[in-house]
């Protein structure tokens, strides 16, 4: 809001700031009439609406381009006068300065383009440019680059522009020309209207060198030409340049096509692009050479610790993460710094110092340019000018000012060098390099390599050497690009040093090499390991204790990003906060509608994989009980299902109500809250809706839900699903009404289906439908049953399951064999079905362990045997879980067989004998067999 300033105070303010701007002094002296206008308007920012009002004033008549040039320059003069006065007087902050200058550029470019386009498209002249494919009138897309694109333009800046037209064709006027020629001519006229220096000055210098092929290319290019250029010739520095690109003229459809379908995929990779570090280092090295050549060390933009280095820091994180995190796909540098503060890839102190330095340097840049309205970022050399600059920045002397400036530049340089520090080679690099395939034939090379391994503590260096040589000689390695091979060569010395710290080293090495085979085809992830060597010990530690964890990383290498810092890995999930975060990622993004579903599918997958991985790391540290782990994995599945249901419903074209009267019911491990890392989801779909189209609509919804869960995208899948527990199994309807489901349970369901119902629960969806299911479930489980018949049915089902899962090995199958997990589950299911009519508390969804304890307390079986069995159940599940994670035997001294199978979790027959005996005893107590 403007602060009132009387005329005498305004005059005093203007007089006090005139020494800091020779341009203001000259302009006011040459055009005295502008002074009163400045004094009257000094309290008010110069908004774009006022700029447009000036250009469109009824008293103004534009007859030709000379009139246009004059009007634009008169506007610019007024804007600069007021803006400089407000800034130097402390009435305008940095944001106002940048916003006002950006508005001036946008407004003058659009106004000039409209005038020139109208003149050129007169029927008696060239006529309207028409697309040869669409037949529609074509408009010039002007892309603002650099600071104009970012909405942070300088007061005496040039403007970086690129001219693009949607499609080729011809104009329809008397002097017909090609669209290309039309837009080139239009572009030249526009440039002249902005940059030609007349008696009234200029508006903006125009720089067109950022267009494809630079100065040697046509002034205007078509959209297809730009797309082809990005695909075939686009360079890394151009990705950096196009981050700030912004379309300021043209049709909204063409703008969306350009920015979202052509520019965005070029700038922001779908994966985490850690190769951007090396590209930015190269770009910075070129900048350094130019600074040295031109002696620009006192240039606050290009010199050490200058504005450009801050921009490089923000942009490298945008290039690395923007394809995954749409929050970072923004233009203003300060805006990116704010987002980085929220996302914390850098310490808060670093962000604060970079922000303060950027604001100080930009404020200084403007004061350097106010002196003579020159595009300069060089510190003054003359003592008088040094004094003026120091005082305009609020310092009494140039020395104090320089001390403050140097502090900011030193901070920027320090942070820049920390982020872009050159990779250090291991002291063993040269020796390890000689083991390369083309150099590893001689005995001396192998011996030198083995000796290095021996010094690292490897007990069998010959075996390890042979395995590394085999890896280098593999088809996989030979098919890698040269750059990927070089990355692995560079990584190997450090990897071998790290692996030596995590025995058993032969197993750890094997798993690491398998991981490299998985991620080697993604250079960005090899770059991650190079740029962040602190991740290597974390990867090796995981690999040393868990085959499953190592394989999971290989399937989802993007999870390496989770290992960049140890903070957050061992913190248990805050589900309300994670729910909010997921909602933001899914819905609060600027993604084209045609790409939204793919984006949301990948967001869900990345989110689910990240949460699983964080739980996995905490689990492997021994900080998580198995029951708590299952609770968290179930909470995660519930959250994913809730979001998938909403997204699938939104995606339906035919809907008859705002919210679906639809429920997802969880069975098995999902229903019993005993999910493991690789569990599939047993689900059933129900609805309560008497609309005539309800069945077909909800069937389509269920199909969509299953598609969202099981589709393989570039990010993998969410969950495998099992839909066979619905009425009549695979031959039954995919969705059922609550009434039909209830009737089936009472009239047609088999005993095994009622067994399954003991572990079922409402997961997500319509709450009323969920309550109806839960009431039906309780009523069904509380039906009195003939215990003799029930035992017979359950024993028959147990025999069928044993036949369906034969164990041809001498090992004990923890899940399927007698005395294993399924025996405990069948015992619990019998107790619920047999006695819930007397003890309704048995219908609670409290898990097998709690139900066993409750059965003992109720006297349904021996309390001692129930306690022993629930303890055994815990041990069986823990061992099964450990085996599936480790993929190897437990340490020496345990009875686990080396033939153990991850898939079936089998152990030596004499292992877990106490647990099995406890299960046998309870089984005999219940079933008498």
Curated annotation (Swiss-Prot):
Catalytic activity field: [glutamine synthetase]-O(4)-(5'-adenylyl)-L-tyrosine + phosphate = [glutamine synthetase]-L-tyrosine + ADP; [glutamine synthetase]-L-tyrosine + ATP = [glutamine synthetase]-O(4)-(5'-adenylyl)-L-tyrosine + diphosphate
A GO CC term attached to the entry: cytosol
PANTHER family according to UniProt: BIFUNCTIONAL GLUTAMINE SYNTHETASE ADENYLYLTRANSFERASE_ADENYLYL-REMOVING ENZYME (PTHR30621:SF0), GLUTAMINE SYNTHETASE ADENYLYLTRANSFERASE (PTHR30621)
Region annotated Adenylyl transferase, chain positions: 433-929
Identification of the protein by name: Bifunctional glutamine synthetase adenylyltransferase/adenylyl-removing enzyme
HAMAP family assigned to the protein according to its UniProt record, in alphabetical order: GlnE
Broad EC category: transferase
